Amino acid sequence: MNSFSAFSEMFGSDYESSVSSGGDYIPTLASSCPKKPAGRKKFRETRHPIYRGVRRRNSGKWVCEVREPNKKTRIWLGTFQTAEMAARAHDVAALALRGRSACLNFADSAWRLRIPESTCAKDIQKAAAEAALAFQDEMCDATTDHGFDMEETLVEAIYTAEQSENAFYMHDEAMFEMPSLLANMAEGMLLPLPSVQWNHNHEVDGDDDDVSLWSY
């Protein structure tokens, strides 16, 4: 048993969307609203070409976050195995925050998903994780193990008050702490400090992958 039947049985009839009332409601779809080109031309595009609120990580997994209406803050929804699961999570949050004016990734999200009664970040995060889990069998490839852990997603679903672009610079800043980190590691393992030349400028050459840190 999968998809919506499992979803309904797991969480009950209360999971029907409050926006589904009224037969004349036609949701706005992301596929009919092309995205604007990313303003950052220097970096690789990570946004999904169609789905709203979905970005790809280097690991191949997909993350989702939504901006709160009339604010610069975002609600983090978690990390997912597939773009479709992340897109479902987005739809839950979009419906909770914007109602019928929400731009959805899937038209049936308006009536298949439970919309939390409050706009509290924790309530939205929980509903988003549950929706992604319920649609896992439908969206994933037909394999024996889809590798999705709802508990892990719920743990990762933490609220962030920063714009998503800041995440890149956080990782970039961590790069400059590597010399002291290696020194601490060497001291802890009673090994000599590796002789690596660190260049403290803002340009990192990604071609130096064959640098050896320790020589045995």
Swiss-Prot record:
SMART domains: AP2 (SM00380). It comes from Arabidopsis thaliana. Belongs to the AP2/ERF transcription factor family. ERF subfamily. Induction: By cold stress. Positively regulated by the transcription factor ICE1. Subject to degradation by the 26S proteasome pathway in freezing conditions. The keyword Phosphoprotein does not apply. This is Dehydration-responsive element-binding protein 1A. The gene is DREB1A. Changing residue 19 to I: In strain: cv. Cvi-1. One of its GO terms (molecular function) is DNA-binding transcription factor activity. GO terms for cellular component: nucleus. Transcriptional activator that binds specifically to the DNA sequence 5'-[AG]CCGAC-3'. Binding to the C-repeat/DRE element mediates cold-inducible transcription. CBF/DREB1 factors play a key role in freezing tolerance and cold acclimation. Keywords: Activator, DNA-binding, Nucleus, Stress response, Transcription, Transcription regulation. A motif (Nuclear localization signal) lies at residues 35-47. It holds the Pfam family AP2. Interacts with 14-3-3 proteins GRF1, GRF3, GRF5, GRF6, GRF7, GRF9 and GRF10 in the nucleus upon freezing. Residues 50-107 bind DNA. The keyword Nucleus applies. It is found in: Nucleus. It comes from the Eukaryota. GO terms for biological process: cold acclimation; positive regulation of gene expression; response to cold; response to water deprivation. SUPFAM superfamilies: DNA-binding domain (SSF54171).
